């Protein structure tokens, strides 16, 4: 696998973030969901609809020839319109998606580290996420300093303190 670089996400990355959201939703190839089903599900589309709103931040990983290989971004949600990993107003929730051929190559770690730094620089005290308990990415989140604060069904809500 060749190298990759990480850059800040921009408003024109909306389609790319949507692609990576579909990758994140389909982490388990045995239970893969059709793209249109993921996009029609508000639980997922919530994370990309209207990108880049005030308070949104994120990073994109690109391989050779600037081909996108992954993205990690965060978004603020209101208490009356929460995401899966909502823990409170003012706490951004992140999502991470990496193309399958680039998984286990350091892309997810690089993106996660960059987004955590970005959220910290934006003044956030914490950042949260929601992950299915069987998703191997849960180990990435644990080693990056995220800890479980709630479990519901097959999902865990995790938080990392930024200051």
Where are these regions (language model features)?
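Conserved GNAT acetyl-CoA-binding A-motif
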Residues: 119-132
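Conserved acetyl-CoA-binding loop of GNAT-fold acetyltransferases
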Residues: 142-152
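A short helix-loop-beta-strand connector motif used in the catalytic cores of GNAT acetyltransferases and
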Residues: 46-60
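A short, internal acetyl-CoA/4′-phosphopantetheine-binding micro-motif in the GNAT/acyltransferase core
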Residues: 93-104, 131
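Conserved acetyl-CoA-binding loop-helix of GNAT-fold acetyltransferases
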Residues: 104-117, 142-143
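Conserved acyl-donor/pantetheine-binding loop and adjacent beta-alpha core of acyl/acetyltransferases
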Residues: 63-96
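Conserved GNAT-fold acetyl-CoA-binding loop/helix
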Residues: 25-48
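Conserved N-terminal entry element of GNAT/NAT acetyltransferase domains
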Residues: 1-12, 163
């Amino acid at each position: 696998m060749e190298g990759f670089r990480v850059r800040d996400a921009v408003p024109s990355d909306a389609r790319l973030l949507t692609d990576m959201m579909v990758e994140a939703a389909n982490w388990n190839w045995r239970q893969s969901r059709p793209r249109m089903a993921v996009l029609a599900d508000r639980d997922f589309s919530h994370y990309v609809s209207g990108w880049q709103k005030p308070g949104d931040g994120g990073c994109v990983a690109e391989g050779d020839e600037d081909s996108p290989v992954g993205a990690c971004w965060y978004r603020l949600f209101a208490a009356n319109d929460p995401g899966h990993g909502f823990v409170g107003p003012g706490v951004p929730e992140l999502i991470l998606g990496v193309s399958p051929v680039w998984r286990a190559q350091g892309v997810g770690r690089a993106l996660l580290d960059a987004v955590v730094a970005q959220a910290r620089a934006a003044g956030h005290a914490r950042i949260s996420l929601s992950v299915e308990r069987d998703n191997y990415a849960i180990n990435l989140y644990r080693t990056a300093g995220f800890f479980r604060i709630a479990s519901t069904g097959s999902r865990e809500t995790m938080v990392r303190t930024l200051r």
